[in-house]
Structure formats: C-alpha cells, structure tokens
Amino acid sequence: MKDIKLKDKIAQGINDLFYIWKREFQTTFRDQGVLIFFILVPLGYPLLYSFIYDNEVVREVPAVVVDDSHSSLSREYLRKVDATPDIQIVSYCADMEEAKQMLKNRRAYGIIYIPSDFSDNIAKGKQTQVSIYCDMSGLLYYKSMLLANTAVSLNMNKDIKIARSGNTTDRQDEITAYPIEYEEISIFNPTTGFAAFLIPAVLVLIIQQTLLLGIGLAAGTARENNRFKDLVPINRHYNGTLRIVLGKGLSYFLVYILVAFYVLYVVPRLFSLNQIGQPSSLVLFVVPYLAACIFFAMTASIAIRNRETCMLIFVFTSVPLLFISGISWPGAAIPPFWKYVSYIFPSTFGINGFVKINNMGATLSEVAFEYKALWLQAGIYFLATCWVYRWQILMSRKHAIERYKELKEKENLSKQISD
C-alpha cells in the first residue's frame, strides 16, 4: 500500500512538474514584458552592440597641429602622420590656445605639438620630442593618436640613423635600422579591434541580465495576480518545492538553449568575430552557466514585489558587472574586495570561461576553475531557490488559512447577529 502511495506521489509530482513547465512556457509567450526580455532583447541587443563596434578600430581621427618649427623636417613628419589611416589633420593652428579651443568645440580630438627646436636638435645630434595631447573621453582616440605618431617617429628614426651611418650596402642599412629583427603578431585578436575584445563578454552578460529581468518580471506579475501578493499561487499543482523549481527552471532552460546558441554562436559568426574553440567544449560549458544564471535569477526574484521593481534593481548592474568580470578592466587591477563580490555572479566565470574557449581555443580542462565554479554556483543557487520557494509555499498557506479563519469568523458573526 505504501509503495502504491509512493508511486502515486511520484507520478503526481512529475505531472505537476510538467503542468508548471507548461504554464511558465505559456507565460513567457503571452506576457509581452517577459517576451521582450526573453526573446526580443537577446535577438536585438547583440546585433546592436556588434553593429556599433563592427569597424573594430577608429580611423581618421580629426587632429590639429601646432608647428613652431616650420622646418622641412617637421612638415615631413606631419605629412607622414596625415598619411596614416588613423589620423586626419584638419587644421594648422597658430598657437596652443587656438588648438585647445578646437578641442573644446569638438572639431578635433587631438593636438600634435612640434617645438621650435625640433629640426635644430636633430641636426645637432640631440634628442628631440613631439608632444601629443588627446581627448581622453574616448580611449580609442588616444590609441589612434599614439599608434600613428609612434609609427611615424620610428620610421623617421630609421631614416635618420641610415643617413648618418655612412653605410655602403642595403644590408648594412637594414642592420643599422633594425639591430634586432622582430615580428609583431597579435594573438587571439588579429585585428587588435575593440569588437573582438569586448563583444564576447557583452554577449555572455546579456544572457544573465535578460534572465534576471525576465524572471523578475514574471515573479512581479505572479505577485500582482495573487490575492495575498505571494510568489506561489494557491493551486494543487503548486504543492511541492521541487516540482515548482524544476518546472520553472526547465521552462527557462529550454528557451535559453536556443537563445544561447543564437547569441554565442550565430552572432559572432555573422560579424566574423574570432571563433576557434571546440563546439563540444563550448556546449558543455554553457550548460552549467545557464543553470547557474536561471537559479540565480529565481533566487533573486524573491526581492521583486511588482513588475517595475526588476528594472530598478537589475538594469544598472550591467556595466559594473562587465568591469569586475576582469575582461574590460584587467583582473589583476581589481581590488580583492570587488573580486570576491564578482564571484557571486555567474557572469564572472561565464565571461572568462567563454572568452578562453571561444577566442583562445582553450579546452574544458583548461577552464576547469571557471567550469567547476559554475557547477558550484548552480548547486548553491538551486538550494537557495528551493529554500526561497519552500518559504513562499508556507507563507502562501499561512495567508490562505488566515483568510479562511477571517471569513469563518465573519460568517459566525453574521449568524449570531441574525439569530
């Protein structure tokens, strides 16, 4: 008899699990807000970010010149700088005040200053200098200014060395110009571009943030539709912790398997971003990342009291999470406190592991730290979600019983009055 009851309970639990999965799946596609965060945002945001940074590098940065030397050598230097793809000289200013005013009016983003003793020092065999002033509100402007001027100065240094060496053969000129021959190879980012460096991290973060917003919005809707403002409704199918957590989690997981494939595989391929990882390693890595994000979002949804709250709580976290992940800002430069704070979020391990696998060709064993951390987070947040929903079930029952007693007392009171 006990075996039959146990089998019935298991069968009922599985039936309830799929009922909850079905209801949550329907909510995803019927609720416009959830649909936006689960489908439209993951479809649109990756394309938007990728289109913005598709050029990879900034070209033809407007720059102005203050040339106090007025020599043939300074003019040669400026012609070569203007010939680079990085800088476009838009004006020659009489003094630094005029140049500063052009920067202030956003007509240029950098100043090239050549001192009056530029060619004299070179003729005397002394070291000279060229000063660069750049608008640091955009680091890519600074990068273009620095690269162009560095390349031109090195090229002119080579020509000056050769001219003064008195060599008689081309081979001697080569040795004079480059005593140590070197070859520059950009590993894992051949274009040294901004998109190849930043977009993979943004794509991984989009998955976590849209899950937080979508699940939070669904939780806010559930509370608003509940008579007692509880997260779990009074329903015989919602009479167990595991069936609720697994039913909801399975629904989100099935939706985001497709979303993750699009965001992490299709989008990088559309924009020709670096993809050298093994697909099998990537799939095995994404599974715990999705699980950790889903249960993390379900745990965090306990704080959501209405539909709008999730926007106030979660949206602003995107930029800080990108910084403390260790990709856009060097991990070694992040203070220990913020590094430990970053370990709370699945995106930290997800971003670092994905970049290593997808962009650097790492295997699963080479990202063992991130992989194990994601499974650990998935387990911890699963238990936290179970605790949260168990507490919500008890609170829902408590409110229902209190309401029942209240109605019963009113009924008894009305009978006494009528008698």
Can you say where each PLM-predicted feature lies in the sequence?
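Extracytoplasmic/periplasmic domains immediately adjacent to an N-terminal transmembrane anchor
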Residues: 1-196, 366, 391, 397-419
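Hydrophobic alpha-helical transmembrane segments of multi-pass membrane transport proteins
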Residues: 44-47, 185-267
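Loop-to-transmembrane-helix entry motif
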Residues: 28-35, 206, 247-253, 257, ...
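Hydrophobic alpha-helical transmembrane segments of integral membrane proteins
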Residues: 38-39, 196-197, 316-317, 342
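Alpha-helical membrane-protein architecture signal
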Residues: 14, 18-22, 196, 237-250, ...
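Membrane-spanning alpha-helical segments of multipass transporters and channels
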Residues: 48-49, 70, 91, 101, ...
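Hydrophobic core positions of alpha-helical segments in small-molecule transporters
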Residues: 37-38, 200, 246-247, 310-313, ...
